[in-house]
């Protein structure tokens, strides 16, 4: 049996918000980094309604000066899914 980690989207969104604020960046600053026409995607990430693409997570890690693993939050061990 294998235990499969599951990303906690809400906690990851909270973490993205925390990391953004810790670096002193605004949502508009991130919008400019990504070249987005609107900030909606970033707000969705922060609310846990959507996940950034892997490419965007790598950019966030570089901007926040952290690792990719520092951005993504997984559900706790008791909530991990088991598969055969």
Where are the model-predicted features located?
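A short, Lys/Arg-rich alpha-helix, primarily the initiator
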Residues: 1-23
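Short, charged recognition helix plus adjacent turn
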Residues: 1-6, 62, 72-84
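Residues within the helices of the helix-turn-helix
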Residues: 17, 28, 58
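The alpha-helix within a helix-turn-helix
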Residues: 20, 31, 61
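Short alpha-helical DNA-recognition segment
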Residues: 24-44
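DNA major-groove recognition helix of helix-turn-helix
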Residues: 45-46, 56, 75
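DNA major-groove recognition helix of helix-turn-helix/homeodomain DNA-binding modules
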Residues: 55-70
């Amino acid at each position: 049996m294998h235990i499969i980690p599951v990303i906690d989207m809400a906690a990851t969104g909270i973490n993205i918000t925390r990391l953004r604020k810790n670096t002193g960046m605004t949502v508009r600053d991130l919008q400019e980094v990504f070249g987005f026409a609107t900030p909606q995607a970033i707000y969705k990430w922060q609310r846990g309604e959507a996940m950034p693409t892997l490419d965007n997570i790598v950019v966030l890690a570089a901007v926040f000066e952290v690792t990719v693993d520092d951005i993504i939050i997984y559900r706790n061990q008791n909530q991990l899914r088991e598969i055969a």
